[in-house]
Amino acid sequence: TQGVSSAASDVYKRQMKVGAGGLINSITIAGTVAVVTASVSHYGIEALAGYGLGSRLEIIITPLVFGIGSVLTAAVGINAGANQMSRAKKIAWVGAIISFIIIGVISIAVAVFPELWLDNFETNILSEKYAILYLIIVGPFYCFFAAGQTLYFASQGTGKIFFPVIVGIIRFLTVSVVCYLTITFSWSLSHIFYAVSFGLAITGIGLSLCMLGPDWNSEIN
């Protein structure tokens, strides 16, 4: 009975560790969106509306990434639990590449032909101009975010998400600093959109680098 209780306690601690990390990661994502939205609002209602139109593309991206990522969490977890880290790593990479390609095709198509997306909404000329600017600057980088989030879900399967969460914090801080500087020095709105793009790239590249770390190259204890 004591052995069963100890095992149950260990499982609970592992779940709480992953859950706490996931909570922090969600806060950094929501915080980034809040900071960007507040910063864009300084440029007027039309700019805010344009940003809203462009950023709603994430509504399509998020479920697709979750669909792939949730499968990876289970697949990686099974293999990591069996100490088949090489196989788990391969599964994670395949999932990330699939996400990168699928979202890359969608986001680049929208960046090149923004009317494909914007024609689904009623817009005025000024807000549409800002939306097009956002899609051109940020659109091509959604594939990095998709791949990064897919690898984040895969990392949950290993039970070790410290470094992935750090990547999310770095993204939040980077975007926040650039937004602050943009507002303080009255830079153009495009600087905020470039900050968003850089943040998406941080997610993809950062989570990819995490795959090279010890969490993916050692046995699960």
Question: What is the predicted role of each segment?
Answer:
Residues 42-45, 82, 157-158, 186:
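Helix-loop interface residues and adjacent transmembrane-helix termini in multi-pass membrane transporters
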Residues 1-8, 12:
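Single conserved hydrophobic/aromatic residue that forms the stacking wall/gate
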Residues 129, 172-205, 209-220:
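Membrane-interface helix-loop junctions in multi-pass transport and translocation proteins
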Residues 27-60, 78-79, 116-125:
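Helix-terminus/linker motif at the lipid-water interface of multi-pass membrane proteins
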